Amino acid sequence: MKTPGFDTYDPWSGEQRPLYLAPMAGVSDLPYRLLAKECGADITITEFTNSTALSREATASWRKMESDPREQPFIPQIFGGEMEDMVTAATMLEESADVIDLNFGCPAPKVTNICAGAALMGEPQRLVTMVENIVDAVNVPVTAKTVSYTHLTLPTKA
């Protein structure tokens, strides 16, 4: 397994906890992430990007995945509702990524309507199978953003 450049399992406490820049759609482009690094962020994450678009090599989506050696560790975040596209996108990112982050937390209708993001929280076995397939396919650590969705009404895949 590729070493991410920091100990992903070391318990952090007090002053030793890393400062994260949370991924923000339409905001977390490369210049913004580099600025955050210069201002003290230890870890930055790309904005979430559709795995189907990445697997089809859509230029605009790959632009969101631009990285720079100053941005270490490099952590791209992907989302999607199609298992094959999620696995394909993760394997395509594996060489450049130090960690791959999966978004299972976005409640936006444009995401949940394709049974992605928070919608997958309503299908735990499907979510677990997706994560297992991605973890088995790549040699970098995989993390996930989730949400407690008890008050959300989400669509499920038929």
Please name every model-derived segment.
Residues 46, 99-107:
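Non-cysteine beta-strand/loop elements that form the S-adenosyl-L-methionine
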Residues 16-19, 73-75, 138-147:
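Short beta-strand/loop segments at the ligand-binding rim of alpha/beta enzyme cores
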Residues 51, 114-125, 129, 152:
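Conserved non-cysteine loop/helix-boundary elements of the Radical SAM core domain that shape
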Residues 50, 80, 106-108, 148:
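Active-site-proximal loop/turn and secondary-structure-junction residues that shape catalytic pockets
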